[in-house]
Amino acid sequence: MADIKKSSLELIGGTPLLEAARYSKKAGVEKATILAKLEYLNPAGSVKDRIALAMIEDAEKSGKLKQGATIIEPTSGNTGIGLAAVATAKGYKAILTLPDTMSVERRNLLKAYGAELVLTEGAKGMKGAIAKAEELNQEIEGSVILGQFTNPANPAIHKATTGPEIWKQTDGKVDIFVAGVGTGGTITGVGEYLKEQNPNVKVVAVEPAGSPVLSKGTPGAHKIQGIGAGFVPDVLNTKVYDEIITIENEDAFAEGRAFATSEGILVGISSGAALKAATILANRPENEGKVIVALLPDSGDRYLSTALFNTQN
């Protein structure tokens, strides 16, 4: 009876690392090891639970967020779900602005946690959602924008939790870390921590081929929800990664499906992108015998209406 959690917030973090042997075999990987960090096992279903709790608690400690206040956040989905869940658990109201291109499942999840949604024009991307959030912040007294793209608590929580978890789980035997870049918090925090432990760890950023902002400075439309915000976020440490791999929409979809049908685990579109990058790295001759950790941000059940799984339409 001693190991009983008192709050859903205590369940955030500590996600498992899976050796994706069946997926690797299906992907033709023979000479490197791919490990998948399964972030969908956080209580609200994604890696963003970590930053939702961290940003809210940071705002509470600084006095910026007071009891009964409204939390406003521009989000492409998962941060909003995490914030809606944490806000509910802590007694805050949440208003979330997001592009109308986000999946129906994500919108319904946000509503299910009690959040109010304000949809913005999809073509304007996250910039449109950010502008709307700032407008609402001016209108609603006592409201707070936590600002995942600019908030130092975002990368800090990954440096404090996700990075150390990976290091401990691999017993320090991680050679390459692969992560998609949305806000840049995950790759910044984890990358900095791993490189502090071992400067030889290679950190690889993944971005959509349709919006290669980091590699070519060119924003554009793409279908890999959760990464490729269309600009370089303030919290992203652009010196932490050693390489950028761009992934096509269809490759992200294909690898997400391949993981589901090999490992029996549904993962999201950005997870498919990270897996594709991991297989590219694993099949390079110079990476023979190396351990590659790919961070898989969320579950595929958030994308059943998208081209990831809805292949009949």
For every predicted segment, state its role.
Residues 1-313:
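PLP-dependent amino-acid enzyme catalytic core
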